A protein has these predicted regions:
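Extended hydrophobic/aromatic-rich secondary-structure runs
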Residues: 1-2, 109
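Sec-dependent N-terminal signal peptides
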Residues: 3-11
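Active-site-adjacent structural segments surrounding the nucleophilic cysteine of cysteine proteases
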Residues: 11-82, 87, 203-208, 215-223
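Conserved active-site-adjacent core of cysteine acyl-enzyme catalytic domains
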Residues: 19-38, 80-181, 186-190
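Low-complexity, Gly/Ser/Thr/Pro-rich intrinsically disordered linker/tail segments
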Residues: 175-223
Length: 223
């Protein structure tokens, strides 16, 4: 217990690099980057910074981490506000229509789907979903669903999350927004979420593979 108290009382503990060479001379000048728990939680996610910007952050997450666009939550939010009613946005947040109009302005194609369970499991590209989180409507990015029915979410407020299919269905409104455009990278960080832990990696529970999206390949086909 004493070491825990000492650790908690340290005035500044920051993530950085561990100079392994100082402790293991045989390794030479070798630095290993260290990622904090917070950094890992929000890896490859554009975080939301206002109560009403989860939609903008979700759009920015897909544009940046699936398509490689140099953008962020603020730029997307400013762009969507230019086409929306600011007062409505302050009270209710952005809508899927606001997101669709903004993405179409960028030259992306956007389509909404209402899906049943089996079709949902076949989604193979990151999409935007609307969830009910403790009574609040909240946009997040559905990254993938693996063969064990684990749902991988990139949540602008809560970070990278892995929940059960049942939990997802209980909070999801049944509609997702698919974004299709040039520059999609199937090897980008967003379409290939990391497992929560090494134990999941050992289980071979990697999400279903995702290829370059077009309307015919938003969903995987059964063999």
């Amino acid at each position: 217990m004493r070491w825990l108290l000492l650790l908690l009382c340290c005035p500044a503990v920051w993530a950085g690099s561990v100079p392994l060479g100082e402790h293991l001379p045989a390794l030479g000048d070798l630095n290993k980057p260290v990622q904090s728990i917070l950094e890992r939680r929000y890896a490859n996610i554009e975080r939301q910074h206002t109560d009403f910007s989860c939609g903008a952050a979700a759009v920015a997450t897909i544009l940046r981490y699936a398509y490689g666009h140099a953008t962020n939550e603020r730029w997307v939010m400013d762009g969507m506000l230019a086409m929306a009613d600011p007062e409505q946005v302050k009270h209710y947040g952005f809508s899927m229509l606001d997101m669709k109009q903004y993405l179409q302005m960028l030259g992306m194609r956007v389509r909404g789907y209402r899906l049943g369970d089996e079709k949902l499991r076949q989604v193979r590209v990151p999409t935007i979903v609307l969830l009910n989180i403790r009574g609040y409507q909240h946009f997040a990015v559905l990254r993938a669903i693996d063969r064990h029915d684990r749902v991988y979410l990139a949540d602008p407020a809560l970070g990278n999350r892995v929940i059960t299919f049942k939990e997802f269905k209980e909070s999801w409104n049944g509609i997702l927004l698919a974004v299709i455009g040039a520059g999609y990278r199937p090897d980008a960080p967003l379409p290939t979420p990391l497992p929560r832990s090494l134990s999941e990696a050992r289980m071979g529970s990697s999400p279903r593979s995702m290829k370059h999206p077009c309307w015919n390949s938003v969903f995987s086909t059964k063999s």
